[in-house]
Structure formats: structure tokens, C-alpha cells
A protein has these predicted regions:
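Extended, subdomain-level signal for the structured scaffold at the beginning of enzyme domains
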Residues: 1-93
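Conserved small/polar residues in nucleotide/adenosyl-binding loops
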Residues: 98-99
Length: 99
């Protein structure tokens, strides 16, 4: 069974983030919501607070088959500015691409 991580940054587009989570869970897929900060609570672009399942520092990237980065003006900028996440995505892609 596939395991998915969706990374949430303050300012993420709620529709793009939560719809993915909803559909995956309805299909029986495992998807973890991950805050890119040390706080589990993330604020969406329309000021809707969302509580993630874990924080970035708690993620073992080797457990995941798919990484999701939802859009949203400020959320996208915050994802891109998160250097630890960008490094992990590069490493994840390098390993995935070779298999």
C-alpha cells in the first residue's frame, strides 16, 4: 500500500491541501499531513487553522512513496524557503528516479 506525505506551510491553499487528504483517505490510502514548522498547527491561506499529524522533523522520508506539495501564494513561498524540506525532496527524487 502506498504511503503519502503532504507538506503544509502557513498560507497553503486549503482546497489543494485538504481535498487531496480527503480523497486519499476515502480511497484507503495512508496520507500524513506534515507541518513544515515545529508547530503542528498550520494556517491556511483563508485563515483556516489545520492541525497536521506531525512536523517535518518527525518525518522518515524512506517510509513514503509519494510527496505532495499543495499550492497557495504564500504557502508555496514558505515551502520553497524551507531548506530542510527542499534538501529532502532532492534526495527523495534522486532515490526514486534510480528505481
Amino acid at each position: 500500500m502506498s504511503k503519502i506525505a503532504i507538506f503544509l506551510a502557513n498560507g497553503f491553499e486549503e482546497i489543494e491541501g485538504l481535498t487531496v487528504v480527503d480523497i486519499c483517505r476515502r480511497c484507503g490510502l495512508t496520507i500524513d499531513m506534515v507541518s513544515i514548522t515545529e508547530e503542528k498547527q498550520v494556517m491556511g491561506s483563508h485563515k483556516i487553522p489545520v492541525t497536521a499529524d506531525m512536523t517535518l522533523s518527525q518525518v522518515n522520508f524512506e517510509e513514503y512513496d509519494c510527496l505532495v506539495l499543495p499550492g497557495g501564494g504564500q504557502g508555496t513561498k514558505n515551502l520553497e524557503a524551507c531548506e530542510p524540506l527542499m534538501q529532502q525532496i532532492d534526495a527523495f527524487y534522486a532515490v526514486s528516479y534510480t528505481h
